[in-house]
A protein has these predicted regions:
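A short, N-terminal "cap"/entry segment at the start of jelly-roll beta-barrel domains
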Residues: 1-29, 64
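Conserved short histidine dyad/triad with adjacent acidic residue
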Residues: 17-18, 33-48
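Histidine-centered metal-chelating micro-motifs
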Residues: 42-43, 77-78, 82-87
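Short beta-strand segments in beta-sandwich/barrel cores
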Residues: 42-43, 59-64
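Glycine- and acidic-residue-biased ligand/ion/polar-headgroup-sensing regions
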Residues: 50-61
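A cytosolic small-molecule/anion-sensing beta-strand core signal
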Residues: 57-58, 73-74, 92
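Short acidic-glycine-tyrosine-enriched beta hairpin
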Residues: 67-81
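Ligand-binding loop in jelly-roll beta-barrel domains
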Residues: 82-102
Length: 102
């Protein structure tokens, strides 16, 4: 049985000049992953075949969605439609949850 409780703050860890990802929960219809981006790291332009939601836990960065910059800061919530082009850049150590819905 999967553990039904996780303290996200305790799971946050940053790799020097890298990006860490940890699967928080995975079901047939929902994938939730914690991403921890070290300051200065980037995730290049890409798309997803699933609808997604990003919730920023801490840090500061830029989320580019369909050529529009959105500030990533604690509490920000970003909705991603299927096949939307997006990229990310961490201006500080930044952590967020990515939820993908099938």
């Amino acid at each position: 049985m999967e553990n039904n409780f996780k303290n996200l703050k305790k799971l946050i860890a940053y790799s020097k000049n890298g990006i860490l990802s940890k699967v928080i929960s995975k079901t047939e219809k929902l994938d939730i992953t914690l991403f921890c981006m070290a300051e200065g790291t980037e995730i290049s332009e890409h798309t997803s075949t699933k609808q997604g939601f990003v919730y920023v836990i801490e840090g500061k960065g830029i989320f580019n969605l369909a050529e529009k910059d959105i500030e990533m800061s604690a509490g920000a919530f970003i909705k991603l439609d299927k096949n939307m082009v997006h990229s990310l850049k961490a201006e500080q150590n930044t952590s967020f949850l990515l939820s993908l819905v099938s």
